[in-house]
Curated annotation (Swiss-Prot):
Belongs to the universal ribosomal protein uL15 family. It holds the Pfam family Ribosomal_L27A. This is Large ribosomal subunit protein uL15. Keywords: Ribonucleoprotein, Ribosomal protein, RNA-binding, rRNA-binding. The keyword DNA-binding does not apply. One of its GO terms (molecular function) is rRNA binding. One of its GO terms (cellular component) is cytosolic large ribosomal subunit. Part of the 50S ribosomal subunit. The gene is rpl15.
Amino acid sequence: MIRKSKKITKMRGSRTCGYGEAKKHRGAGHRGGRGNAGHQKHKWLSVCKFNPDYFGKYGFNRNPGLIKQLETINIGELEEYILKYKDAFQVEDGKVVVDATEIGFEKVLGKGRISTAMVVKAVEFSEGAKEKIEAAGGEFVEL
């Protein structure tokens, strides 16, 4: 077993126990404060050198009232919904009439495949959704 004497035992009788002058081991005064203290005062040069972007604001946050959060549904999911609940939708001229806002969606996106001709009413459509609806023989109506 290793028997190593502790540092404090070796330092007995040395007055300062390896901390230099007696004043240097009191509180945080020898360091100029604890942690980030003094970074805008006496430690400013070290901030400029090592962390220049620490202070100040950058960028901006958009006003949440200006951001549109639309509920979306893909065109493939919409067709599955129509096939699942056939009785809930009207058929005019061989096309199923779907109002996306009535089922809780504002925007129709273009992911998926459709084979049903339908008239889709929504607030917004993506370009892909418009193309797929027209390719299936349907039409879209923006509200």
